[in-house]
């Protein structure tokens, strides 16, 4: 249960260097043996019937206790045939004007009817019909707010959405249906919402865990929800005392999402929060190679490998699928030094819920 919280959130927009929003709130698994009978001098043998009960008792089902915060989680409360209608409260561009693409932070009302958790997703059904005259299909988006929302009253849900616009092979400009629908919303506009869904990216229960977050672009969404709960909120039943380490990869510095928020968290929690950016078009490593997220991680390779050997280290990866191979390449050589097959070890981490991936 969340107690009173207070946090200043800076969301840069194209019209001003930052939008400062003051947020304060009050919260929200028989064997019958052979028998002889003596009668005078004649012995009468009575052969006993031997029966054996071969029915086996059903095996006891062992329920594996999850290391994640799954208690009371709700999934698929709202389905495509009966979605929840949310209303847009806020829609702010959070990338600079010179960024390669627009990303928007969108806040919807839920009136407490969509009980999501950090790490879950919701679906959005855009208005209109497709070329076949049928309603558009839903698109899933990772939730970018903590369970009590940006306003701390458990009545909103936030998304981080990049506007999809590209030129196809025929030279035509193509716009993503749902992303453009969302990025064009004005306060007061409605949107059909489904879900919540997902358990893969739920936070670990252990408040002393090491949580390594690897995100590219809008893959930052679930990690913003994690970090708000850890560092911007106060809860009676949860206080994070571990280490949160965020690696965020983007093409340009004007594409860094929620930068001011994260820097404020780091300033106030220097012992519990580490923050590393990888800006591929502006930064290089000592070899002159572009600074992708795996390039930045390579600078801390030995330290990361030591953390991955611990039972209370959890890795979460969200964003572009391409970063997976680069991260594997780093870990293969490190694990080999200890005589460990990295790909097999990663499977063990997945089974123990310590390696969690949501890429696209």
Swiss-Prot record:
NADP(+) binds at residues 142, 162, 218, 250-251, 280-281, 290, 319-320, 358. PROSITE patterns: FAD_FR (PS51384). Its EC number is 1.18.1.2. Disulfide bonds join 178-183. GO terms for molecular function: electron transporter, transferring electrons within the cyclic electron transport pathway of photosynthesis activity; electron transporter, transferring electrons within the noncyclic electron transport pathway of photosynthesis activity; ferredoxin-NADP+ reductase activity; poly(U) RNA binding; protein domain specific binding. The modification Phosphoserine is found at residue 179. Its main location: plastid. It comes from the Eukaryota. May form interchain disulfide bonds with LIR1. It is found in: Plastid, Chloroplast stroma; Plastid, Chloroplast thylakoid membrane. Keywords: Chloroplast, Disulfide bond, Electron transport, FAD, Flavoprotein, Membrane, NADP, Oxidoreductase, Phosphoprotein, Photosynthesis, Plastid, Thylakoid, Transit peptide, Transport. Its cofactor is FAD. It is an enzyme of class 1 (oxidoreductase). Induction: By nitrate. It holds the Pfam family NAD_binding_1. InterPro entries: FAD-bd_FR_type, Flavoprot_Pyr_Nucl_cyt_Rdtase, FNR, FNR_nucleotide-bd, FNR_plant_Cyanobacteria, OxRdtase_FAD/NAD-bd, Riboflavin_synthase-like_b-brl. Residues 1-49 form a transit peptide. One of its GO terms (biological process) is photosynthetic electron transport chain. One of its GO terms (cellular component) is chloroplast thylakoid membrane. Belongs to the ferredoxin--NADP reductase type 1 family. This is Ferredoxin--NADP reductase, leaf isozyme 1, chloroplastic. It comes from Arabidopsis thaliana.
């Amino acid at each position: 249960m969340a107690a009173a919280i207070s946090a200043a959130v800076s969301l840069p927009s194209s019209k001003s260097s930052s939008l400062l929003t003051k947020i304060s709130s009050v919260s929200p698994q028989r064997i019958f043996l052979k028998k002889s009978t003596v009668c005078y001098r004649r012995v009468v043998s009575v052969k006993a019937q031997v029966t054996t009960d071969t029915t086996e008792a059903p095996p006891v089902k062992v329920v594996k206790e999850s290391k994640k915060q799954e208690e009371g989680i709700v999934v698929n409360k709202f389905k495509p045939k009966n979605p929840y209608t949310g209303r847009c409260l806020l829609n702010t561009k959070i990338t600079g004007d010179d960024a390669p693409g627009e990303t928007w932070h969108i806040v919807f009302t839920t009136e407490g009817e969509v009980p999501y958790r950090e790490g879950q997703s919701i679906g959005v059904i855009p208005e209109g019909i497709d070329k076949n005259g049928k309603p558009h299909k839903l698109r899933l988006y990772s939730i970018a707010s903590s369970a009590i929302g940006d306003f701390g009253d458990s009545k909103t849900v936030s998304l981080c959405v990049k506007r999809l616009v590209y030129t196809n092979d025929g030279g035509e400009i193509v716009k993503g249906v749902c992303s453009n629908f969302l990025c064009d919303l004005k306060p007061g506009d409605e949107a059909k919402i489904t879900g919540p869904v997902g358990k893969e990216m739920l936070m670990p229960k252990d408040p002393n865990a090491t949580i390594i977050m690897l995100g590219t672009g809008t893959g930052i969404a679930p990690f913003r929800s994690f970090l708000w709960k850890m560092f911007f909120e106060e809860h009676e039943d949860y206080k994070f005392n571990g280490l949160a380490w965020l690696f965020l990869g983007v093409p340009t510095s004007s594409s860094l999402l929620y930068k001011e928020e994260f820097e404020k968290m780091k300033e106030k929690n220097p012992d519990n929060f580490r923050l590393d950016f990888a800006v591929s078009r502006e930064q290089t490593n000592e070899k002159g190679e572009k600074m992708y997220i795996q390039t930045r991680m390579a600078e801390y390779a030995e330290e990361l490998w030591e953390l991955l050997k611990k039972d209370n280290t959890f890795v979460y990866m969200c964003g572009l699928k391409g970063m997976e191979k680069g991260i594997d390449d780093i870990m293969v050589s490190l694990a080999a030094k200890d005589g460990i097959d990295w790909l097999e070890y990663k499977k063990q981490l997945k089974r123990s819920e310590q390696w969690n991936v949501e890429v696209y």
